[in-house]
């Protein structure tokens, strides 16, 4: 920690501000400097990024620099930007420097932690792999989440990403007694506002912290907001020993903001114009997301793929850190099959018989095999019709359609729209249900019985009701 000192602004180029200090009073890299902005009447935070010689530092502003002029006094706080942490922040919405932005008054019962922190050491980390049960059949069966892992969410607008995110927040809060952090990184302000209001209505806000650095904010704020949310999550993991869910929407915007900051600082660009420190920036964030012996941080990261190019350095660098990928399909959403998770494209590194167990692995692969065969047969069905298929293929198609429908389930957060009560399905029940479908135990039940139910017993019950309705 450097000592407090006063400097003066010597140059301003957009969000980059150069500040000169007296001999021997230079701040450290990542120290927070404070300047009073007369235009806004607020304190503006500058983060030191470079020492450029002649007792001058180059800083990046966390808010607009409009109103700053050369010669203004800048105070060195002698420490990095700090984020508020603790129980008092639950249910609140804050910005990158920890200021509340939800108009609900000042934060109470909080302490402050620096946003730049080392990742947990190998000795502190938990090496055993554990599944984080989400209660969502399609995810738990085909792309299970590892506790303390990183999961990538791929999906466009309107495929049910927000509902899925909110359902996970609800399940972590209710079923696992855990907390969720949501980092809005460089996305639309309207979407952040909608999410806040929807969470309020769904009753999950009190177990959540929202941290926003949106599209309209300077690159410095967008680049650091994920670290603020992560610091809040680390408190609940390390001090309270909880399982925490950290949502980052969108991880691509984090890279994009880093690229802007890098260019403003005058660094030579790397491949496709990205910052030369891309892998380091990503690693510093991702390595802090892990399980320790006290608790875990499991991260779900929405990933925008520019021009659908998977080889772009931004998504490519993110992939190296991911343990599972969840692909949301527009085709499934159009058919009303929610959650619209693609069962063939979604993957998880822990779908391994040595980790999830032989039965889970074999059932998951059996489900994918049947669905893949159905996909292969769809062209033949479209041209010649079902009648031209062999008896074996007809049976596969029938089972595949039942599996497709059984992968759906009603969610708690969408209950008021669908009128169907939400369900949380334990992994054991999920495996049992799909295993029995694959074994052919329910070949005589109608397809409709498997749509939007929880366990296989509910499907059997629904089939009885459907049969009675037909008889009546």
From Swiss-Prot:
Task: Look up the EC number in the record and give it.
Answer: 7.1.2.2
Where is it mostly found?
membrane
Q: How does the protein associate with the membrane?
A: Peripheral membrane protein
Recall the GO molecular function terms of this protein's record.
ATP binding; ATP hydrolysis activity; proton-transporting ATP synthase activity, rotational mechanism
CDD domains membership: ATP-synt_F1_beta_C, ATP-synt_F1_beta_N, F1-ATPase_beta_CD
Residue sites binding ATP per the record? 155-162
**Record's subcellular location:** Cell inner membrane
Under catalytic activity, the entry for this protein gives:
ATP + H2O + 4 H(+)(in) = ADP + phosphate + 5 H(+)(out)
Q: List the disulfide bonds.
A: none
Q: Which UniProt keywords apply?
A: ATP synthesis, ATP-binding, Cell inner membrane, Cell membrane, CF(1), Hydrogen ion transport, Ion transport, Membrane, Nucleotide-binding, Translocase, Transport
One GO cellular component term of this record is: proton-transporting ATP synthase complex
> Which class of enzymes does this protein belong to?
translocase
- UniProt KW Cell membrane keyword: yes
> What HAMAP family has UniProt attached to this entry?
ATP_synth_beta_bact
Family, similarity comment: Belongs to the ATPase alpha/beta chains family.
Q: Report the NCBIfam families cross-referenced here.
A: atpD
What does the UniProt function comment say about this protein? Produces ATP from ADP in the presence of a proton gradient across the membrane. The catalytic sites are hosted primarily by the beta subunits.
Assembly mode: F-type ATPases have 2 components, CF(1) - the catalytic core - and CF(0) - the membrane proton channel. CF(1) has five subunits: alpha(3), beta(3), gamma(1), delta(1), epsilon(1). CF(0) has three main subunits: a(1), b(2) and c(9-12). The alpha and beta chains form an alternating ring which encloses part of the gamma chain. CF(1) is attached to CF(0) by a central stalk formed by the gamma and epsilon chains, while a peripheral stalk is formed by the delta and b chains.
Q: What is this protein called?
A: ATP synthase subunit beta
Organism of origin: Fervidobacterium nodosum (strain ATCC 35602 / DSM 5306 / Rt17-B1)
Q: What is the lineage of its organism?
A: Bacteria, Thermotogati, Thermotogota, Thermotogae, Thermotogales
Q: Which gene encodes it?
A: atpD
């Amino acid at each position: 920690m450097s000592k407090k000192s006063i400097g003066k602004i010597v140059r301003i180029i957009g969000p980059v501000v150069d500040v000169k200090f007296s001999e021997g009073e230079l701040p450290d890299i990542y120290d927070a400097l404070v300047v009073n902005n007369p235009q806004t009447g607020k304190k503006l935070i500058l983060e030191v990024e470079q020492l450029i010689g002649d007792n001058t530092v180059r800083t990046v502003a966390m808010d607009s620099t409009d109103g700053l002029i050369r010669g203004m006094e800048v105070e060195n706080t002698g420490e990095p930007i700090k984020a508020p942490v603790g129980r008092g922040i639950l249910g609140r919405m804050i910005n990158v420097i920890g200021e509340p932005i939800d108009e609900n008054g000042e934060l109470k019962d909080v302490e402050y932690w620096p946003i730049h922190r080392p990742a947990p050491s190998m000795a502190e980390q938990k090496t055993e792999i554990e599944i984080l049960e989400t209660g969502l059949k399609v995810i738990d069966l085909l792309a299970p989440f590892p506790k303390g892992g990183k999961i990538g969410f791929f999906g466009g607008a309107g495929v049910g990403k927000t509902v899925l995110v909110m359902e996970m927040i609800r399940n972590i809060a209710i079923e696992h007694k855990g907390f969720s952090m949501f980092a809005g990184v460089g996305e639309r302000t309207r979407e952040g506002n909608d999410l806040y209001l929807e969470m309020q209505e769904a009753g999950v806000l009190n177990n959540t912290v929202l941290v926003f650095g949106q599209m309209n904010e300077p690159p410095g704020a967008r680049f650091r907001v994920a670290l603020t949310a992560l610091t809040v999550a680390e408190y609940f993991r390390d001090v309270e020993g909880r399982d925490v869910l950290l949502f980052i929407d969108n991880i691509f915007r984090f890279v994009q903001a880093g690229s802007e900051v890098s260019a403003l600082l005058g660094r030579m660009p790397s491949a496709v114009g990205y910052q030369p420190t891309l892998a380091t920036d990503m690693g510093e964030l991702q390595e802090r997301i892990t399980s320790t012996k006290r608790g875990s941080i499991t991260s779900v990261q929405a990933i925008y793929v520019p021009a659908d190019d998977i080889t772009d350095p931004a998504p490519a660098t993110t992939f190296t850190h991911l343990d599972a990928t969840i692909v949301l399909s527009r085709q499934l959403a159009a058919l009303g099959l929610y959650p619209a998770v693609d069962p063939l494209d979604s993957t998880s590194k822990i779908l391994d018989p040595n980790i999830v167990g032989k039965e889970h692995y074999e059932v998951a692969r059996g489900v994918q095999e049947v669905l893949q065969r159905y996909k292969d047969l769809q062209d033949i069905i479209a041209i010649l019709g079902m009648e031209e298929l062999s008896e074996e293929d007809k049976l596969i198609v029938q089972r595949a359609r039942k599996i497709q429908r059984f992968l759906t389930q009603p969610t708690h957060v969408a209950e008021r729209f669908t009128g169907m009560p939400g369900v949380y399905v334990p992994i054991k029940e999920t495996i049992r249900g799909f295993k029995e479908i694959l074994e052919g135990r329910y070949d005589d039940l109608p397809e409709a019985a498997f749509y939007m139910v929880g366990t296989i017993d509910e499907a059997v019950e629904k089939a009885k009701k459907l049969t009675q309705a037909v008889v009546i």
